[in-house]
Amino acid sequence: MSQNTGKITQVIGAVVDVEFEPGKLPEIYHALRVTNPAINDSENNLVLEVAQHLGENSVRTIAMDSTDGLKRGQAVLDTGKQICAPVGKKTLGRIINVIGEPVDEMGPIGNDKENPIHREAPPFEDQSTKVEAFTTGIKVVDLLAPYARGGKIGLFGGAGVGKTVLIMELINNIARQHGGFSVFAGVGERTREGNDLWMEMKETGVLEKTALVYGQMNEPPGARARVALTALSIAEHFRDDEGLDVLLFIDNIFRFTQAGSEVSALLGRIPSAVGYQPTLATEMGELQERITSTKNGSITSVQAIYVPADDLTDPAPATAFAHLDATTVLSRQIAELGIYPAVDPLDSTSRILDPQIIGEEHYAIARQVQYILQKYKDLQDIIAILGMDELSEEDKLIVARARKIQRFLSQPFFVAEVFTGSPGKYVELKDTIKGFQEIVSGKHDHLPEQAFYMVGSIEEAVEKAAKLAAV
């Protein structure tokens, strides 16, 4: 079969137009290859993905790497298929890029199978509707916004409130406890963080059960817009072909939208609200609908979602909200109090915070904790203007308990040991429920509030109080 080749007619940044012979246009999403000497010495080293048919036998493509060094008239090869990701157990412990090439300098992947990165979501009849909670070992999450196995979880937060640290702690806790395979997609984040994560995983022994797919901040928008799909293809293989329960971590889903917006502008589409692409909801839907549980296996995804200027109504985070089963909202106000993880206990939600799923006792205590914290929030204006003395005895008690709860929601992390100097804590769900139940019932009203800060279980808080009293 003769190979279908075209030639470059124009290059504008990450967008390359290619002309083919009449009747030989490659399909949308097909991968084309061209040699770019500026990247390295190998042949056909640059992948272009067909995005539009322009008419007059031309296609407009998005480059997956640098286009510096391309010339007009250069020959372009149509591969006749989409970008494909290597799948299977050979990808575990490796770092690959958007086009499935290893970037960890450890030789070829050696996989037997590869899957296209654009696929249909599983049909309704194949999807599973079973709902069960799974424990993360992080108190504030397990108590107030529990995660569902096979669900989609979003970690929302502005710059520097701890999304990546929380996602690294979840990888550490869940991958250790869960013991299954994980896939991590680094979408448009810092290269340094990617390196830190790799080192961290190597040290904790989680690496051999994880496939890492990276497309960092310095990559062209085409790579950042597609790297999440490459990771998803790997996770889908474990779910569909091997019948496993997989964890998919994406850091950061906002960068997927941001890259889509850059690509959209380069393709000449008219922007919609706040300058985002007109296809924002469609692109997000195509990605999110593939992350689901089937009768074969499940994909549980944890996605960090950057919130521009701390505005949750921005179209990018607002579009992601609609797809999620649980949201963990990180708050700058809580981070300023020095309470980490800086999860907002009143803003975070979960679809499975339901007595029929998590049990009556857990549900009742979670609601009591939220009631006390909400009441404290309502009283804060009065305290700020008139002071604590003007409150009734009942309100003073609520404030004291709320401050203890607030501090008890903090917890030392394993991945932050190097910064905090205190060893990380994994708290079992029963211990979390017991601890908050005792605070809410007033059993520890006599203890100082600082005893509850940065501890694991309630027993540790009592122990810390005894130490403070002895000083």
UniProtKB/Swiss-Prot annotation:
**Which keywords annotate this record?**
ATP synthesis, ATP-binding, Cell inner membrane, Cell membrane, CF(1), Hydrogen ion transport, Ion transport, Membrane, Nucleotide-binding, Translocase, Transport
Cite the EC number: 7.1.2.2
Q: Mention any one GO cellular component term assigned to this protein in its UniProt record.
A: proton-transporting ATP synthase complex
| SUPFAM superfamilies xref list | C-terminal domain of alpha and beta subunits of F1 ATP synthase (SSF47917), N-terminal domain of alpha and beta subunits of F1 ATP synthase (SSF50615), P-loop containing nucleoside triphosphate hydrolases (SSF52540)
Chief localization class?
A: membrane
From the UniProt record, which GO molecular function terms apply?
A: ATP binding; ATP hydrolysis activity; proton-transporting ATP synthase activity, rotational mechanism
Note whether Ion transport occurs among the keywords: yes
Specify which residues bind ATP according to the UniProt entry for this protein: 157-164
Q: Where in the cell is it found?
A: Cell inner membrane
Domain of life according to the entry = Bacteria
Q: Which InterPro entries match?
A: AAA+_ATPase, ATP-synt_VA_C, ATP_synth_F1_bsu, ATPase_a/bsu_AS, ATPase_alpha/beta_chains, ATPase_F1/V1/A1_a/bsu_N, ATPase_F1/V1/A1_a/bsu_N_sf, ATPase_F1/V1/A1_a/bsu_nucl-bd
Q: What membrane topology was assigned to this protein in its record?
A: Peripheral membrane protein
Transferase listed as a keyword: no
Q: What class of enzyme is it?
A: translocase
Q: Which reaction does it catalyse?
A: ATP + H2O + 4 H(+)(in) = ADP + phosphate + 5 H(+)(out)
Q: How does it assemble?
A: F-type ATPases have 2 components, CF(1) - the catalytic core - and CF(0) - the membrane proton channel. CF(1) has five subunits: alpha(3), beta(3), gamma(1), delta(1), epsilon(1). CF(0) has three main subunits: a(1), b(2) and c(9-12). The alpha and beta chains form an alternating ring which encloses part of the gamma chain. CF(1) is attached to CF(0) by a central stalk formed by the gamma and epsilon chains, while a peripheral stalk is formed by the delta and b chains.
Which family does the record claim for this protein?
Belongs to the ATPase alpha/beta chains family.
What does this gene product do? Produces ATP from ADP in the presence of a proton gradient across the membrane. The catalytic sites are hosted primarily by the beta subunits.
User: What name does this protein carry?
Assistant: ATP synthase subunit beta 2
Its ancestry begins with: Bacteria, Pseudomonadati, Thermodesulfobacteriota, Desulfuromonadia, Desulfuromonadales
Encoding gene per record: atpD2
